[in-house]
């Protein structure tokens, strides 16, 4: 005798699972009414928060470094341009 089949998961259930496991951000789609009230899984909460902080810090450092490098590069180009113009 066949066991009763479980229905396939709905779109919202799949999306909730993806959000819980961090594969999708809760703001990926406009239909997030069911995601907003979803707490992060309790077991790995502190580690997850720590990782998020580390990732944000890392992104901040990278972006700051890129901004400084861009400013230095522009200053260098202006300096070279001025030196070349003075020689003529």
UniProtKB/Swiss-Prot annotation:
Query: Domain of life here?
Result: Viruses
Whether Membrane counts among this entry's keywords is yes
Keywords tagged on the record: Membrane, Phosphoprotein, Transmembrane, Transmembrane helix
A Gene Ontology cellular-component term: membrane
Keyword Chaperone assigned: no
Phosphothreonine sites (modified residues): 6
Q: What is its main location?
A: membrane
How this chain sits in the membrane, per its record, is: Single-pass membrane protein
Per the Swiss-Prot or TrEMBL annotation, the motif PPXY motif is positioned at 8-11
As for subcellular location, the record says:
Membrane
- Where are the bilayer-spanning segments? 58-78
Task: Report the protein's function.
Answer: Down-regulates the TCR/CD3E complex and the transferrin receptor TFRC in host T-cells by blocking them from recycling back to the cell surface.
**What domain comment accompanies this record?**
Late-budding domains (L domains) are short sequence motifs essential for viral particle budding. They recruit proteins of the host ESCRT machinery (Endosomal Sorting Complex Required for Transport) or ESCRT-associated proteins. Contains one L domain: a PPXY motif which is involved in the interaction with Itch, a member of the Nedd4 family.
Provide the assembly information: Interacts with host ITCH; this interaction probably mediates ITCH degradation. Interacts probably with NEDD4.
User: What's the name of the protein?
Assistant: U24 protein
Tell me the name of the encoding gene.
U24
